[in-house]
């Protein structure tokens, strides 16, 4: 009888808790409302400005493929 109680407890309590996705398990959607309404030109400008902030190649190794070397 004890074994059946343990099995019932496992399947009725622990199994649903392990399979439920709680709010903490969901990825954060930061500023999703602000970025969905942008037109393609505005979103392209945001992406390009973020790419410009990256470190560029060194002057000796520059092949002219990045904007900051010009």
From Swiss-Prot:
Organ and tissue specificity: Expressed by the venom duct.
Listed InterPro entries: Conotoxin (IPR004214)
Protein name: Conotoxin TsMLKM-02
Compartments, record wording: Secreted
Domain notes: The cysteine framework is III (CC-C-C-CC). Classified in the M-1 branch, since 1 residue stands between the fourth and the fifth cysteine residues.
Propeptide residue range(s): 25-54
Signal peptide extent: 1-24
Statement: the UniProt record of this protein carries the keyword Secreted: yes
S-S pairs: 56-68, 57-66, 62-69
Keyword annotations: Disulfide bond, Secreted, Signal, Toxin
Major localization listed first in the record, in broad terms: secreted
CC per GO annotation: extracellular region
Species assigned in the record: Conus tessulatus
Pfam family, one: Conotoxin
Family recorded in the similarity comment: Belongs to the conotoxin M superfamily.
GO molecular function, one term: ion channel inhibitor activity
